[in-house]
Amino acid sequence: MKTLYSLRRYYPVETLFNGTLALGGRDQETTGFAWWAGNARLINLSGKLLGAHVAHAGLIVFWAGAMNLFEVAHFVPEKPMYEQGLILLPHLATLGWGVGPGGEVIDTFPYFVSGVLHLISSAVLGFGGIYHSLIGPETLEESFPFFGYVWKDKNKMTTILGIHLVLLGLGAFLLVFKASFFGGVYDTWAPGGGDVREITNLTLSPSIIFGYLLKSPFGGEGWIVSVDNLEDIIGGHVWLGLICILGGIWHILTKPFAWARRALVWSGEAYLSYSLGAISVFGFIACCFVWFNNTAYPSEFYGPTGPEASQAQAFTFLVRDQRLGANVGSAQGPTGLGKYLMRSPTGEIIFGGETMRFWDLRAPWLEPLRGPNGLDLSKLKQDIQPWQERRSAEYMTHAPLGSLNSVGGVATEINAVNYVSPRSWLATSHFVLGFFFFVGHLWHAGRARAAAAGFEKGIDRDSEPVLSMTPLN
């Protein structure tokens, strides 16, 4: 049946040029969207949209469980995780499961349990997704008013925002409890080369925690990415958890103020654009975190950072040549600067050569050799431990550089290993996803603003190929 009145009133985003394509009751005519617009057809069907989201969560959790078990099945305890292309087990190891001193894996059973739990969860979510997509009510407003909503209902929207914030806050506290009471987490800075320990002396000083937000993002400052101890990381999660929970309660109990009602666009597509913008920012921050930070992402599991691999090479050859009789304190390099050691712009003693650009690296295998003014010459001559030599030689040959065809490491390094670091994968993937989510944010924000202003026309579908095909039903 042709609709005789304008759908504009109900579906402000697209005005239809034609509505002849029918698809299982969710056709163009009744929804204002063609089949390829995906979940847009479900904008006003809260029950079916719930099904789509639950099913999507099921797919995500299924991937996590299946990939987790795949990594367990292929895991070789004798090789470091980062040499085996693992991206999930390093996260579990960082949480303190299955590892001992030096990041050595002593038990893979917790990893197996994690995979199985995710698979079971995905089955429950998958069932819920199928149920709500095919069997459950199309809309929740009538039968389950608590779970129902209308996109324009500003008070309900901020209540939903509040519930999400409370859940995020509880998630932050899960990490706090794991680190402080349930077996601890892996600390790469533990003496002697890293170990699992419970974090009991949390940093709760607001000047320290919020001081990170005020730091410059550049150089040795590094904004929040510069955090280099677990006390600050776990203490930061206490603050995050409190802020999210209190903010969530605030949004549940209050209605949006007049300025917010005026300033924001209140539609499903607008909320989508806000979310995409936020996730984009998180993606870019995660990219920098995994690339530069070796405390939250320990090098024992993820491989060295770029600066770390470079400094490790300088250290390795300093050790070798010192054994061969070189005076590393005074040897001159080809440019007239120190060959092994030189001074930073602010006077600290640092490694010489090309790695001078990474002079503000901090790493657990190197810090014991520093004194009050940079690297300590007497410690370099007398205090270097075998574990520091072994680790730096290992990191030197596993720089987080590489291409998709797995020719990894520094192009000029003859001892490099044929691998690509998980750091490269995680940093690159989060950068690329952050970028695409940003583009999605711009796209949906533009459409939402246009719809609110009332001039979104849609696409002329007269020549759409699917219109000349046999209907599916």
UniProtKB/Swiss-Prot annotation:
The modification Phosphothreonine is found at residue 15. [CaMn4O5] cluster binds at residue 367. Binds multiple chlorophylls and provides some of the ligands for the Ca-4Mn-5O cluster of the oxygen-evolving complex. It may also provide a ligand for a Cl- that is required for oxygen evolution. PSII binds additional chlorophylls, carotenoids and specific lipids. It is a multi-pass membrane protein. The chain crosses the membrane at residues 69-93, 134-155, 178-200, 255-275, 291-312, 447-471. The keyword Lipid metabolism does not apply. It comes from the Eukaryota. Pfam families: PSII. The modification N-acetylthreonine is found at residue 15. InterPro entries: PS_antenna-like (IPR000932), PS_II_antenna-like_sf (IPR036001), PSII_PsbC (IPR005869), PSII_PsbC_sf (IPR044900). The keyword Thylakoid applies. GO terms for molecular function: chlorophyll binding; electron transporter, transferring electrons within the cyclic electron transport pathway of photosynthesis activity; metal ion binding. One of its GO terms (cellular component) is photosystem II. Signal peptide: none annotated. Its main location: plastid. GO terms for biological process: photosynthetic electron transport in photosystem II. Keywords: Acetylation, Chlorophyll, Chloroplast, Chromophore, Manganese, Membrane, Metal-binding, Phosphoprotein, Photosynthesis, Photosystem II, Plastid, Thylakoid, Transmembrane, Transmembrane helix. It is found in: Plastid, Chloroplast thylakoid membrane. Residues 1-14 form a propeptide. One of the components of the core complex of photosystem II (PSII). It binds chlorophyll and helps catalyze the primary light-induced photochemical processes of PSII. PSII is a light-driven water:plastoquinone oxidoreductase, using light energy to abstract electrons from H(2)O, generating O(2) and a proton gradient subsequently used for ATP formation. HAMAP family: PSII_PsbC_CP43 (MF_01496). Belongs to the PsbB/PsbC family. PsbC subfamily. PSII is composed of 1 copy each of membrane proteins PsbA, PsbB, PsbC, PsbD, PsbE, PsbF, PsbH, PsbI, PsbJ, PsbK, PsbL, PsbM, PsbT, PsbX, PsbY, PsbZ, Psb30/Ycf12, at least 3 peripheral proteins of the oxygen-evolving complex and a large number of cofactors. It forms dimeric complexes. This is Photosystem II CP43 reaction center protein. It comes from Anthoceros angustus. The gene is psbC.
